[in-house]
Amino acid sequence: METVSTQRETASSETERTREAASAETTDATFRSLEEGSTISSRYSETASTVSEDAVCWLRRTAIVMRVYGLLTLETAFSVLISALVWLGYPSLGYKCSDDPSPLLLSCTPVLVLGALELTDHRHPSNGLVFALYVALLSFTTAGLNLCATAPIGISSLILTWTLFVACNGVAWEHRLSSVWRDALFTSTLLTVMVSVLASTYTWLHKTLLCLYTVFVGCILAVLFQDVRYIATKMPVSHVIRSSLILYATETLIYHTTLLMLTPVVWSARWDQMFSYLAKLGTYHHYLIDNGTLSVILNTTTATFQSKAA
């Protein structure tokens, strides 16, 4: 009897141990599932917060970029309008840049503007007044330089400038291209153009000028590429006006260079006759004064206005 009772106690104790072990395993499994669920939920919340932060950053960057290119569109439209008014309003207005190449000095204006904007960096003021002054300066110097060319040459230069400008911006915004492929594309394009120029039937003077133009514009586009990448990734909102002016000055510099390249009259300009046209105007003015012609004209005009008023 004692043996049977002992066996029963042993069996009951083993059953209790089995139940305790099973309950412990169930509890551990429950805790593990809860921990896994909390880990998954925390990962999901972290992923959702990261996605939302990326979306907010992308929207902010897009808004900044849209402001920059919106101002660039306004600047370009104003410059085109001023040049069109000069060409259409004064079709007979011409300037013999081959005899007096002084207007060609206006092509240095975009270089000076770019130097002022790039070298001063954060110290350069960025407000509406600075924006208006730079836009007016570049627009009127472009209109003055257009006096050395005809309207078809100006339109051709504008189309070529926009083509180069848009192509460079497109390559800069293409994130899927690695830096190696970008450099290879730029170098191969530059070499292809230069080889095509050297293989052409132009004179050596024309070939030299075209090769210099290609190298110069290539350097401008390389700087433009870096500026566009900065605008796309790192530019703060306080530099919107400054960055739009940099793009506008770069576009104007490409246009001036292309216009001078497509104007054959400039190639044979007499640099020893600089400002000779202004000197002739001054001589003619003194001639009118010395001969009393100017006073006669003024007196006649005054008498005419007085008679009309009476």
Curated annotation (Swiss-Prot):
Organism, by scientific name, is: Human cytomegalovirus (strain AD169) (HHV-5)
Q: Where in the cell is it found?
A: Membrane
| Family classification | Belongs to the cytomegalovirus US12 family.
| Residue ranges of the TM segments | 68-88, 101-121, 125-145, 147-167, 185-205, 208-228, 246-266
Q: Where is the composition biased (Low complexity)?
A: 1-13
Keyword check for Ligase: no
Protein name (database record): Uncharacterized protein HVLF4
| UniProt keywords, alphabetically | Glycoprotein, Membrane, Transmembrane, Transmembrane helix
Cellular component aspect of the GO annotation: membrane
Q: Which residues are glycosylated?
A: N291, N299
- Where is the stretch described as Disordered? 1-28
